Amino acid sequence: MAVTHSLGFPRIGAGRELKRAVEACWAGRTGPAELAQTGRELRERHWMIQSGSGIDLVPVGDFAWYDQMLNMTALLGAVPRRFGFQADALSLDQYFQLARGNAEQPAMEMTKWFDTNYHYIVPEFDRETGFGPGTEWLFDEVEEAKALRLNPKPVLIGPLTYLHLGKERQAGFSRLELLPRLLPAYAAILRRLHASGVPWVQMDEPILGMDLPPEWLEAFAPAYAALAEAGPKLLLATYFASVAEHAVWLKSSAVAGLHIDAVRAPEQVADFLKDFPADKVLSLGLIDGRNVWRTDLRRALEQAESAGAVLGERLWLAPSCSLLHVPQDLSLETSLNPEIKDWLAFAVQKLEELAVIDKGLRLGRQAVAAELAERDRLLQTRAQSPLIHDPGVKRRLEGLSDADFRRHSPFAERSPLQRERLRLPPFPTTTIGSFPQTPKIRAARAAHRRGELNGDAYRDAMRAAIREAVYKQESLGLDLLVHGEAERNDMVEYFGERLAGYAFTKHGWVQSYGSRCVKPPIIYGDVARPEPMTVEWIGYAQSLTKKPVKGMLTGPVTMLQWSFARDDQPRAVTALQIALAIRDEVADLEAAGVAAIQIDEPAFREGLPLKAADRADYLDWAVKAFRLASCGVADDTQIHTHMCYSEFGDILPAIAELDADVITIETCRSAMDLLEAFGAFGYPNDIGPGVYDIHSPRVPAGAEIRALLEKAAAAVDPERLWVNPDCGLKTRQWPEAEQALANMVEAARAMRRAESLAGSAA
């Protein structure tokens, strides 16, 4: 009989209880005790859901107040010394300061978790980094699960992944050198778990799906040989990509079990089944943990049956990865189109699907014949549904030519025309788009959605917010303004709601970072734009000022990456469909007199496949999608794009191929290190490195911002530098945003004065 288990479960709660509790604690409305109680209640609820669905081993340690990688840093006692915190006495408040910064120290860096829209807090390493006793949270949670008479399976980020995803804060050494110091800390954790009666521990090593240098690969076998002696049986878990090239040595390694992703890489199953050792278990991830479509149960059961014929009771069944990446429960969606709802499965439903596969494997197909027949019917209904197909969209794609994917003139010819039209000073200042979403703004949007605020009253409320944003920007002295995005609940959801082919949930929340949750739309069919989406708001903002106002759009790659995309056609085709819709909006904005249009692509890099061999194809269609969206404008219309949380060094040629006139990037948490790559590459167009971290409430001093600008000016031609925050200001409060922007504007003016003096001296 197969063992069923889960690699992780959504932690925020079906009603975003964790978000609300954390933010109440941050605001001082509640204390750590109340927050801790909410955490206990959520953990118990989620464990019981999983156990009630038939999961034999429930994950413990997948819960985190902010981030699971940050939890590992706290557990390992690897808290950066710059904060001055005692690792084994770390309070919740101090834990949050690591992620959010404080008056003395900026936050730890944050970046994307592989190719997902989840963000993790990056560990910091130097030669003196120590590992030792840390927080007790994991051990406490194990005891909580045992008290509920559950079978806990602790989940740890494995040591190689933990080190690899960290960052050196000191030149001249490799973080891999810390492995001999790190392994004893892991071994101590494993011994404690073993002493508490835990039989299995899941060790997540998703970096095995990447192209790793030889020294990193060679470190795995001896590392796990050492850890296997600590007591519990180790299940080494991989996901997001194939690890077939490592099958031979993984099967001979010291771990007691392996988990592989059979959704993203079903072909690798055969490599692992061949000569699979008799003393190990193999866990197959048969249910997609990354997307929301119902599983083809018949095909998944066939996979399980084939593996079971080889492995017998050594077969384990699981989702492909943690269910953190999907919403919690589809049953809460009472207003979703019933036909579309029938095609979907969220975390709870995915565990139910796993139970069907397990039952079919144990009792035979006849025991689940009704479930298989019903699923076959739903899959066929979806494939034939008229909701999916739009012949007009397909005709437009077929009619595209090379001219649709390029600007009229090269950047060197466009740039002077844009400068003349926009009349911007050196080191022009701007923001990334959104301004603080005040309770008043949110209340107006919510009332309008509920039908309690009519269209005229809603328009008046949004216009009032736009007026305030424009007034504040003019008062601060910003050069290129934005309208503030008061009307937008989310940069993807807002546009998706106005596009055909998208569906929306009421409760489909997933965690993005910390307390930040997003509700990704669902792309179920061909995408088209029925009518203009932003022209009214941008045009109104421009009517209030003589300064230029940027149009603000979300790019096609991000619209795809931050949605649950349809799985019945190539992602490249869906991206081009979205690009055509954005292209139409760009044309309408330009016709309305908008001189600068920003097409945000913060998710551009996150779509990059983990393996280099697969990347050229992705970059080809991703670049084409952006260019299709942006290249229909005149030379004197300035196209901006924004990217964040990214390591760009390996994709700079593709970023240059986007041919955006201005790119703004998030660089502050990495102290402008990213900009050096742009400088070394010789990035040809304008660039705006983020000069302060908007994810932290900390307000940087003007001198601090100027120091970053001076560092930027040493890496990139100052004539091509823009000055802007790291990202949008939606989650900040107005007082801190205004002070930070005032300091930013003053730093830009100081740079202009310095450049002017330098020019005079020359």
Swiss-Prot record:
GO terms for molecular function: 5-methyltetrahydropteroyltriglutamate-homocysteine S-methyltransferase activity; zinc ion binding. InterPro entries: Cbl-indep_Met_Synth_N (IPR013215), Cobalamin-indep_Met_synthase (IPR006276), Met_Synth_C/arc (IPR002629), UROD/MetE-like_sf (IPR038071). Its cofactor is Zn(2+). It is an enzyme of class 2 (transferase). Its EC number is 2.1.1.14. Keywords: Amino-acid biosynthesis, Metal-binding, Methionine biosynthesis, Methyltransferase, Repeat, Transferase, Zinc. Coiled coil: none annotated. 5-methyltetrahydropteroyltri-L-glutamate binds at residues 16-19, 112, 516-517, 562, 606. Catalyzes the transfer of a methyl group from 5-methyltetrahydrofolate to homocysteine resulting in methionine formation. This is 5-methyltetrahydropteroyltriglutamate--homocysteine methyltransferase.
